[in-house]
Curated annotation (Swiss-Prot):
Transmembrane segments: 6-26, 66-86, 93-113
Function description: NDH-1 shuttles electrons from NADH, via FMN and iron-sulfur (Fe-S) centers, to quinones in the respiratory chain. The immediate electron acceptor for the enzyme in this species is believed to be ubiquinone. Couples the redox reaction to proton translocation (for every two electrons transferred, four hydrogen ions are translocated across the cytoplasmic membrane), and thus conserves the redox energy in a proton gradient.
Top-level taxon of the source organism: Bacteria
PANTHER family: NADH-QUINONE OXIDOREDUCTASE SUBUNIT A, NADH-UBIQUINONE OXIDOREDUCTASE CHAIN 3
EC number: 7.1.1.-
Record keywords: Cell inner membrane, Cell membrane, Membrane, NAD, Quinone, Translocase, Transmembrane, Transmembrane helix, Transport, Ubiquinone
Pfam family, one: Oxidored_q4
Catalysed reactions, semicolon-separated: a quinone + NADH + 5 H(+)(in) = a quinol + NAD(+) + 4 H(+)(out)
Subcellular location: Cell inner membrane
GO annotation, cellular component aspect: NADH dehydrogenase complex; plasma membrane
GO molecular function, one term: quinone binding
Protein name: NADH-quinone oxidoreductase subunit A
Source organism: Myxococcus xanthus (strain DK1622)
Topology versus the membrane: Multi-pass membrane protein
């Protein structure tokens, strides 16, 4: 067999096909072969050992979403900082200045949201 540009990806394609097949096959097998014994007690909701009270859908305060978005922003910053730190010497001053601009932009954004009161939990 003559190697083609896609030959190195053949094992990956086989693994992906097998994983996809198993992901479809296993739920089908359990659905068809598993026991079905519905009862009233199984249909009730259960929450931490006590009966649930109130509606299942409740509104969350916006501050939770703001904190979650800030976490994602600074988590992405950490993802960008790692490769930069690994290649710090190879990048030289240009890489240093680029990362400095990136970090300063994030710090300015943090100061802005701090001044706007987005991190003030009591308000």
């Amino acid at each position: 067999m003559t190697p083609t540009p896609l030959t190195p990806y053949l094992p990956l394609a086989v693994v992906l096909l097998l994983a996809g097949g198993m992901a479809m096959l296993i739920p089908q097998i359990t659905t068809r072969l598993g026991p079905r014994r519905p009862s009233a007690i199984k249909a009730t909701s259960f929450e931490a050992g006590s009966e649930s009270s109130g509606p299942a859908r409740q509104r969350f305060a916006v501050k939770f979403y703001v904190v979650a978005l800030l976490f994602i922003v600074f988590d992405v910053e950490a993802v960008f900082l790692y490769p930069w730190a690994v290649n710090f010497q190879a990048l030289g001053w240009f890489g240093y200045v680029e990362m400095l601009v990136f970090a300063v932009t994030l710090v300015v954004g943090l100061i802005y949201i701090w001044k706007k009161g987005a991190l003030d939990w009591e308000s």
